[in-house]
Amino acid sequence: MKAIILAAGLGTRFKSEKHKVLHEMLGKPIIWYVLNYIKQSNIVDIALVVSHKKESIIEALKHENVSFFEQANPKGGTADALLSAKAFFEGMDDYILVTNGDAPLVKPDTIKGMQRFLHMVEEYEKIKVGALVLSSFLPDPTGYGRIVKNGKGDVIKIVEEKEATYEQKQINEVNGGVYMFYVPYLKEAVKHLKPSEKTNELYITDIIEIMTNLGYTCRSFMASEITEIFGVNDRWELSFAESVIKMRILENLARSGVTIHSPESVYIEPDVQVELDAEIFPNVVLKGNTVIHKKAKVMNGSYLENATIKEKATVLPMSYIKNSTVEEEAIVGPMCHIRDNSVVGKGSHVGSFVELKNAKLQENVMAKHLSYLGDVNIGKKTNIGAGTVVANFDGKQKYQSYIGQKAFIGSNSLIIAPRNIGDFAFIAGGSVITKDIPPKALAIERAELKILEDKSKVKDE
């Protein structure tokens, strides 16, 4: 089976300079979700029909294995878009999936179910289905095309809302906009397409009635969820679709053994991995290729992007971690900033208002308060006092520093990179370190304290 995605529409209701299918939900463009459910259905030969702003779509999908076809007239209608890719299904004796580029909520299992249905009909009824239409029942079907059936339950046509009779408007089964056509029958049916008298467009839905008139059987297949048939036509529908996908992700994680508190407030992107017995608290954001390992906790309001949180580690509230790793049983936060390939070693603690930039902390390092540690490797069991700064930038270049194991860096110390601080070294609080400190040495660098009696400028009133 092959697949064709129709993405040639103008998308005027988005009111955007960007093509509709490139607007993002959970960090991925709409078209990514469409491609994803097709590929997860084991369909690898995929074509995309484009027109309006085609260059941006082609550029966005340059790493995808898809073929592109251009619809010369983007107002030609959905069937005209399909015919623009006629060369893609020329010579096929199989079914072809046709779906819309703005329909990201279809599930892979639904497409697989449609494929199985076609095989069952062929096996037991010994016929080819001309068209299988994804459908759903809506309590209020206003605005949707109605699925009209005969007494045997076969679909005989799809009637759009504006053309439906009163009786047809009472039908609650609606068109989901996803089709599987048997290509030999499709090629015969499109020969009989005629433009709409009202819009002069060629509609893909007209193919169903044409196939019926040619004697071909058409059927419908019920979507497992109503939301699967919802398209994305404006920014509000984009927000709704994003919330549907997000809740699917969260439900899947929860049913796989992850505790998620107040899931409506949690944001998790599709590529994020969360393992058994991990715990996610309210207002957490997990983006990119973030991985949360077993029994780890990410607490309220934390933002993680391409972060790895190892087993039993804890991210305390309001922490920001990007492109970095927190090792087993480490604690970070609250309100810390960890970035640029930093590593917090096993059992280490990085506390409030501590920033790590390309910093590598080995096991059991303590840096609990108000510090900036940039471009530095710190040995195990070293203590970093409050207010410590490793100054890594001289205005032109950044430099690397090394602090050994079991060193003690006193509060308010300033280490001017590049520096080597040896194992077991002790730096007294308030020191400015401009030289390397050998192992086991005590380093004190302070200006002499002067007390000038009666020189205070504070007036005694």
Curated annotation (Swiss-Prot):
The keyword Phosphoprotein does not apply. One of its GO terms (biological process) is peptidoglycan biosynthetic process. Mg(2+) binds at residues 102, 233. GO terms for cellular component: cytoplasm; membrane. Its cofactor is Mg(2+). Residues 257-461 are annotated as: N-acetyltransferase. Binds 1 Mg(2+) ion per subunit. It catalyses: alpha-D-glucosamine 1-phosphate + acetyl-CoA = N-acetyl-alpha-D-glucosamine 1-phosphate + CoA + H(+); N-acetyl-alpha-D-glucosamine 1-phosphate + UTP + H(+) = UDP-N-acetyl-alpha-D-glucosamine + diphosphate. Pfam families: NTP_transferase. One of its GO terms (molecular function) is magnesium ion binding. Its main location: cytoplasm. It is found in: Cytoplasm. Acetyl-CoA binds at residues 386, 411, 429, 446. Catalyzes the last two sequential reactions in the de novo biosynthetic pathway for UDP-N-acetylglucosamine (UDP-GlcNAc). The C-terminal domain catalyzes the transfer of acetyl group from acetyl coenzyme A to glucosamine-1-phosphate (GlcN-1-P) to produce N-acetylglucosamine-1-phosphate (GlcNAc-1-P), which is converted into UDP-GlcNAc by the transfer of uridine 5-monophosphate (from uridine 5-triphosphate), a reaction catalyzed by the N-terminal domain. In the N-terminal section; belongs to the N-acetylglucosamine-1-phosphate uridyltransferase family. This is Bifunctional protein GlmU. It comes from Hydrogenobaculum sp. (strain Y04AAS1).
